[in-house]
């Protein structure tokens, strides 16, 4: 599977190393979007009169959680319930899933992102400390082990997930035998409402990396929650430390919504449903997201320029923001990352091997691949995702902030 296809690129852009084809989904960059995100009905550049904009808080204002107004429970309990009730599934079960390759592809994206910044930190220190903010069941433990870090703090709002993460870590240590494994600490906490620095075993701990994968958007229910999560992510970073993560692209979500005839969009893999169109408040812009059998919870739109502005409060500077498509095209040129893509089974072989079926039964899901096969210019099998999976994964972006001295 030497040839890799992205349905969003042009058929004519084929070469002997990586083949990409044009797919039915037309990607539109954020600058093409004219849809307005608003604050109480106002454009971002024009905050409502006689109301204090949350982005203009003075640096000296009290930040202690005890001095903040009490927040309602919000949607956090729904998120906790959902993730606590997700069953543990083995590899055999996962491999039969409609989104087996999609999940592996997203996992590969995280691996490439984490690996990139672990190497950046390693240039200045070998004792790397990491905060995994929204660790879930510990899906990134092997990535941190591969990165050779020294210390990991895992935290999540779902207590069952944290316990499963800790069990995975213990199992990892048992199987490692004489091989050194990083120290780990596990915390159950709502990082949108609780100050993590009051909970660490070492009250003076500093981190080189904070990783927040597919989680930060839950905090955009209110300004206070988004700010608290950002504080937890950034306040204990060393100068030169990084806050990295993945999150849905607000511009892409709004673009697809506005192109839809209803308040929802998606396909047989994922669906997104908003309450209404037209106005998208900076905080509390809720939508319901479902992804096959994995996710079915309320989420909140993230207007990325607001996140960039808020991060300045914690001396954080955005060093890059890339769509999944942009990041994929960059990393797949690297032979090591390309091999990892294959090992992780992040792309589906096309055509399917004898006695095997493609994950999608719809022929239109593979039109992009079939066109290239018919051209006879590539070595088979090709590596790709179905059209439906490409559409699902292309709603995301990756980001990286650096702590300024």
Curated annotation (Swiss-Prot):
Sites marked mRNA cap binding: 137, 143, 168, 217, 299, 396
Q: Write down the chemical reaction(s) this protein catalyses.
A: a 5'-end (5'-triphosphoguanosine)-ribonucleoside in mRNA + S-adenosyl-L-methionine = a 5'-end (N(7)-methyl 5'-triphosphoguanosine)-ribonucleoside in mRNA + S-adenosyl-L-homocysteine
According to UniProt, the name of this protein is mRNA cap guanine-N(7) methyltransferase
Where is S-adenosyl-L-methionine bound in this sequence? 110, 134, 156, 190, 213, 218
- Keyword field contains rRNA-binding: no
Which species? Xenopus tropicalis
One molecular function GO term is: mRNA 5'-cap (guanine-N7-)-methyltransferase activity
Which purpose does this protein serve, as stated in its record? Catalytic subunit of the mRNA-capping methyltransferase RNMT:RAMAC complex that methylates the N7 position of the added guanosine to the 5'-cap structure of mRNAs. Binds RNA containing 5'-terminal GpppC.
Give the InterPro entries listed for this entry: mRNA_G-N7_MeTrfase_dom, mRNA_G-N7_MeTrfase_euk, RG7MT1, SAM-dependent_MTases_sf
Its EC number(s): 2.1.1.56
Q: Which Gene3D superfamilies match?
A: Vaccinia Virus protein VP39
Query: Where does the chain bind mRNA?
Result: 106-107
Which N-terminal residues, if any, form the signal peptide?
none
Q: Give residue ranges for domain mRNA cap 0 methyltransferase.
A: 97-404
| Compositional bias of kind Basic and acidic residues | 58-75
Q: PROSITE patterns under this entry?
A: RNA_CAP0_MT (PS51562)
The text of the family note is:
Belongs to the class I-like SAM-binding methyltransferase superfamily. mRNA cap 0 methyltransferase family.
CDD domains per record? AdoMet_MTases (cd02440)
The cellular location(s) given in this protein's UniProt record come to: Nucleus
Query: What is the primary gene name for this protein?
Result: rnmt
Keyword list (alphabetical) reads:
Methyltransferase, mRNA capping, mRNA processing, Nucleus, RNA-binding, S-adenosyl-L-methionine, Transferase
């Amino acid at each position: 599977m030497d040839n890799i296809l992205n349905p969003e690129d042009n058929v004519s852009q084929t070469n002997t190393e990586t083949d990409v084809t044009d797919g039915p989904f037309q990607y539109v960059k954020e600058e093409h979007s004219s849809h307005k995100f608003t604050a109480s009905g106002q454009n971002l550049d024009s905050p409502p009169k006689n109301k204090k904009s949350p982005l203009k808080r003075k640096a000296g204002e009290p930040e202690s959680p005890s001095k903040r107004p009490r927040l309602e429970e919000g949607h956090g309990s729904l998120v906790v319930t959902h993730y606590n009730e997700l069953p543990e599934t083995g590899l055999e079960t996962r491999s039969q899933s409609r989104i087996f390759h999609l999940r592996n592809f997203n996992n590969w994206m995280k691996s490439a992102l984490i690996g990139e910044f672990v190497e950046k930190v390693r240039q200045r220190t070998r004792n790397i400390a990491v905060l995994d903010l929204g660790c879930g069941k510990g899906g990134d433990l092997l990535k941190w082990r591969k990165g050779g870090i020294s210390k990991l703090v895992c935290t999540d709002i779902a207590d069952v997930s944290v316990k499963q993460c800790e069990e995975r870590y213990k199992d990892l240590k048992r199987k490692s035998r004489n091989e050194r494994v990083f120290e780990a600490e596990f915390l159950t906490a709502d990082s949108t409402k609780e100050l993590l620095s009051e909970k660490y075993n070492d009250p003076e701990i500093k981190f080189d990396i904070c990783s927040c994968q597919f989680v930060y958007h839950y905090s955009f229910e209110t300004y206070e929650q988004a700010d608290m999560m950002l504080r937890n992510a950034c306040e204990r970073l060393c100068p030169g430390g990084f806050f990295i993560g993945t999150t849905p692209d607000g511009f892409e979500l709004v673009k697809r919504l506005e192109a839809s005839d209803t308040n929802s969009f998606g396909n047989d893999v994922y669906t997104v449903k908003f309450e209404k169109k037209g106005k998208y408040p900076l905080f509390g812009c809720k939508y319901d997201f479902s992804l096959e059998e994995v996710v079915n919870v309320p989420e909140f739109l993230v207007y990325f320029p607001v996140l960039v502005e808020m991060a300045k409060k914690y001396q954080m500077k955005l060093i890059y923001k890339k769509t999944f498509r942009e990041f994929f095209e960059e990393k797949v040129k690297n032979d090591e990352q390309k091999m990892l893509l294959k090992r992780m089974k992040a792309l589906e072989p096309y055509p399917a091997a004898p006695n095997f079926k493609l994950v999608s039964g719809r022929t239109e899901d593979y039109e992009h691949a079939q066109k290239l096969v018919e051209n006879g210019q590539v070595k088979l099998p090709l590596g790709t995702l179905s059209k439906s999976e490409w559409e699902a994964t292309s709603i995301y972006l990756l980001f990286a902030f650096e702590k300024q001295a």
